[in-house]
């Protein structure tokens, strides 16, 4: 809740503050403030599965592009953004960027993110990430897996992460597989 403003036709009726309106001769509506200063970490699995091309571009490149766009929006909204890349061990952890002027720093760091021929170690990577985060964060995890064993290991690691953080798991859809 930020402030009260005079109700105008077309506003959502659920925003009317009936107690404040009862004290005056006009209707007043609540104005809510957007949450700011959230910590968002874009985590990238740089393992072998992320090298598979989707429409001619590796999955990791599509993930990085999507994350940079979302990071720019988050920075404009007043949130803090970091990048984290891993394969068999953590490879990249940027400090949190705090405003949109720092987006070039994130772009430079993102340019170093590339896939490797190694299998990802979700347990080590996500435990390292958890240890580095001092407060509750939103973690957007870009990954893909081809076999049930990898999926189980990833789910176990994410379960531990979810105890303290919000986690969104993102995969890049392959249109060719969807058509089958």
Language-model features: where?
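An amphipathic, basic-hydrophobic helix/alpha-beta surface used to engage anionic
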Residues: 1-101, 136-143, 149, 156-160
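Short, flexible loop segments at the rims of nucleotide/cofactor-binding pockets, characterized by
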Residues: 19, 115-119, 147
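Glycine-rich loops and low-complexity Gly/Arg-rich segments
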Residues: 42-45, 65-69, 106-111, 119, ...
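Feature representing long, continuous alpha-helical segments
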Residues: 65, 104, 108, 124-127, ...
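Short secondary-structure boundary/hinge segments and terminal tails
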Residues: 92, 128, 178-179
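Von Willebrand factor
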Residues: 102-138
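Von Willebrand factor type A / integrin I
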Residues: 134-135, 149-180
């Amino acid at each position: 809740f930020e402030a009260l403003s005079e109700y105008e036709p077309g506003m959502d009726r659920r925003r009317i503050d009936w107690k404040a309106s009862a004290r005056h001769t006009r209707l007043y509506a609540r104005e809510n403030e957007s949450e700011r200063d959230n910590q968002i970490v874009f985590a990238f699995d740089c393992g072998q599965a992320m090298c598979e091309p989707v429409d001619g571009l590796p999955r990791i490149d599509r993930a990085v592009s999507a994350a940079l766009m979302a990071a720019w929006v988050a920075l404009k909204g007043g949130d803090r953004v970091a990048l984290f890349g891993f394969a068999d061990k953590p490879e990249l952890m940027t400090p949190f960027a705090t405003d949109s002027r720092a987006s070039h720093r994130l772009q430079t760091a993102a340019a170093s993110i590339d896939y490797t021929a190694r299998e990802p170690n979700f347990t080590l990577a996500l435990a390292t990430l958890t240890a580095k985060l001092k407060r509750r964060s939103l973690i957007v995890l870009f990954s893909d897996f081809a076999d049930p064993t990898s999926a189980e290991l990833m789910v176990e690691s994410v379960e531990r992460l979810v105890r303290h953080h919000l986690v969104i798991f993102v995969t890049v859809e392959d249109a060719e597989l969807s058509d089958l």
